[in-house]
Amino acid sequence: MSRLILATTMTVDGVITVGEWYVSEGEHDRASRDQFVGSAGMLMGRKTYEGLAGYWPGETGEWADQLNPMPKFVASRTLEGPLEWNSTLIEGDAAQGVERLKAELVGDLVLIGCGEFARHLLEKGLIDELRFWVHPAMWGPGEHPFEGEEQVRLELIEAKTFDSGVTLLRYEPRAIRPD
């Protein structure tokens, strides 16, 4: 059985839209890449898939070597299969599809992106761990994660600061408080 781990990169003020603030080298970058080693695959929604699939297949280097061959699972109400970039479309209800994947796969399933799909999975209690890679910058305008109505309590399981100033915050969800 797989655990579902959400992993996202953000600024101190919560901006997840990657910009000039992103620090892409050093010990934290290796640690971020290593979270995919031995995983069952990547999980993402349509918007994240379209952005990543439009970029990574033509890239080379350590990140590309790690990400390109990995199995990817994509939830979408509008995409139709077959998908490119070693990706499989989750058919039908996304939450039920993720439950099936968690039951069938061996190794962590890493969820990339913090939009509507991630929020839905968090509200359904399907995310086992959240990893926030917080970069030492405040960026102001931009997309923020988990904009929604539900309130979720988290328990900190690790905080690690790297030489670059990037901090990894690992949490487990504890309770969802309805409105």
Predicted ranges, named:
Residues 1-179:
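Enzymes that bind and transform nitrogen-containing heteroaromatic metabolites
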